[in-house]
């Protein structure tokens, strides 16, 4: 797919969602189209369970194709590959859970728990958005004029590495984990004492899915300013690993916003064991205003 400018991306998303909404019957519109200014715009979760909206498995083939086009439009080539990986991990998890049932294979898009919602009217000049959300997956785009925002966005997986079945060894988001661990392993003893925020990994994500994250007065971890040149390059690569999931026009603008706000304020923290194979561990980036 050719790289789109921001106005081209906004236009492509607008055309796709208009096409999709035109194909919805009255009941589908009732379940899948909501006001932009309602609370649903900020209400989402990565946990399993039902969501408001249209389950992808209930869409017609034509409607499903448009929904998947939207999902691909929202991501870079690598981001789209990561999206498919997250879906494959979820499919593998369910395959293992359904071994006792008379089902040996599932369609990842039709059988897995993902829902589509449209927020607002893509025909109007007012802000509007669309979202595809399900277990461990959230992609949302908010369109204001010819500008596109790509948050909130979430990838996750459980298990992080598939341990049984035909997908044994498949890792979810391996580059994120490897970059964070590589950075941690380059730190000197005094640096590592700052970066190590806990000896055990938390049971869940610290910020959960809250629309406004309450951060401590002083960010935990080691700041960008306390890293040497090579470590800063690793830190930036780790940040870009997340930012560059988005389509380039959105990712590049996000990176400008981050660097303009100041990388010096960003901190890296690690919780849990560092050496691979010694237990669950993970890193995070933290900044009071981000």
Where are these regions (language model features)?
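Long, His/Glu/Asp-enriched segments that create or flank divalent metal/ion-associated functional microenvironments
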Residues: 123-143, 266-290
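Conserved active-site beta-strand-loop modules that form the wall/rim of enzyme catalytic pockets
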Residues: 223
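A short, ordered amphipathic alpha-helix with a cationic face
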Residues: 4-8, 41-42, 169-170
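Short, hydrophobic/aromatic alpha-helical segments in well-folded domains
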Residues: 16, 179-183, 234, 238
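Accessory structured domains or lobes within enzymes
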Residues: 107-112, 206-214, 246, 250-279
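Acidic/His-rich structured neighborhood in mature extracellular/periplasmic domains
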Residues: 43-213, 217-220
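N-terminal module-boundary/linker segments of secreted carbohydrate-active enzymes
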Residues: 2-23
């Amino acid at each position: 797919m050719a790289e789109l400018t921001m106005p081209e991306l906004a236009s492509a998303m607008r055309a796709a969602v208009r096409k999709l909404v035109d194909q919805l019957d009255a009941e589908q519109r009732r379940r899948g189209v909501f006001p932009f200014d309602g609370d649903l715009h900020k209400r989402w979760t990565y946990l399993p369970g039902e969501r408001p909206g249209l389950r992808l498995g209930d869409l017609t083939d034509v409607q499903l194709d448009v929904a998947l086009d939207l999902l691909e439009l929202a991501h870079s080539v690598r981001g789209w590959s990561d999206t498919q990986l997250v879906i494959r991990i979820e499919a593998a998890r369910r395959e293992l859970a359904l071994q006792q049932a008379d089902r040996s294979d599932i369609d990842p898009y039709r059988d897995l728990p993902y829902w589509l919602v449209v927020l607002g009217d893509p025909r109007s000049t007012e802000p509007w958005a669309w979202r595809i959300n399900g277990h461990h997956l959230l992609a949302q785009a908010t369109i204001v004029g010819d500008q596109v925002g790509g948050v909130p966005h979430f990838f996750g997986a459980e298990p992080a590495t598939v341990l049984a079945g035909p997908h044994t060894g498949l890792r979810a988001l391996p580059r994120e984990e490897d970059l964070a661990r590589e950075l941690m392993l380059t730190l000197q003893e005094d640096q590592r004492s700052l970066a190590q925020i806990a000896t055990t990994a938390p049971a869940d994500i610290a910020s959960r899915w809250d629309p406004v994250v309450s951060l401590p007065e002083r960010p935990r971890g080691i700041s960008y300013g306390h890293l040497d040149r090579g470590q800063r390059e690793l830190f930036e690569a780790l940040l870009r690993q997340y930012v560059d999931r988005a389509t380039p026009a959105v990712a590049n603008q996000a990176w400008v916003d981050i660097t303009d706000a100041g990388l010096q304020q960003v901190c890296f923290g690690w919780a849990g064991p560092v050496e691979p194979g010694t237990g669950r561990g993970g890193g995070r980036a933290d900044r009071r205003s981000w």
